[in-house]
């Protein structure tokens, strides 16, 4: 499973929550191994082992070699699930696919703007099409973004303010959903410090590849 999104979209937090969820699901009985550079969060769980990469930052090839070696060494520890912080080059990508071929449940991230873009990015890295287009190996494509949430105290009803919105937006909303349940950004209030928004939430695009899709 590959998770994508722009920098700051919460990918690392999603992986943390996913790994902790897997550990809880199996009651700590599964071996979950992470390889990260560096670990961004403490991932807690009985069966979870976090592994930071160690390499000479002054050597331009050291990082690439460290990722490839770290993934290969991690496979030898026979984890049930493995989380790789990021697929950065062909060596890491091939190592990840090899892990999937041996039955390891593998999660990682890429920088793309869409779920479908993950496939193109892996292709650009040089992954063998025989591996890339096998839905038994590439089982999930996920792209996520963080979007601001409307302030619950000052948000306003879409129906009452649609005359202030772009016509194409109004038509699209009316076509896709029940407008009585739609709200738009309000004028701001003390609770949101005048911004009209309060907090952020994930919006995710999820593709589960099939043979026909690939």
Can you describe what each PLM-predicted range is?
Residues 1-214:
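Short, flexible helix-loop junctions that flank or precede catalytic/ligand sites
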């Amino acid at each position: 499973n590959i998770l994508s999104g722009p920098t700051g979209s919460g990918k690392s937090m999603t992986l943390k929550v996913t790994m902790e969820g897997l550990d809880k699901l199996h009651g700590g009985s599964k071996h979950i191994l992470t390889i990260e550079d560096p670990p961004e969060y403490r991932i807690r769980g009985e069966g979870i082992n976090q592994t930071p990469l160690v390499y000479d930052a002054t050597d331009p090839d050291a990082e690439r070699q460290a990722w490839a070696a770290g993934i290969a060494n991690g496979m030898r520890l026979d984890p049930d699930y493995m989380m790789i912080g990021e697929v950065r080059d062909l060596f890491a990508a091939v190592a990840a696919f090899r892990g999937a071929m041996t039955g390891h449940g593998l999660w990682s991230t890429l920088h793309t703007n869409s779920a479908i873009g993950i496939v193109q990015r892996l292709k650009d890295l040089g992954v063998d099409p025989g591996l890339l287009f096998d839905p038994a190996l590439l089982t999930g494509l996920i792209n996520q973004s963080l979007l601001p949430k409307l302030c619950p105290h000052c948000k306003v009803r879409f129906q009452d303010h649609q005359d202030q919105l772009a016509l194409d937006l109004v038509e699209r909303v009316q076509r896709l959903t029940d407008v009585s349940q739609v709200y738009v950004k309000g004028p701001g209030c003390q609770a949101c410090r005048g911004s009209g928004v309060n907090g952020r939430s994930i919006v995710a695009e999820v593709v589960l590849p099939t043979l026909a899709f690939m």
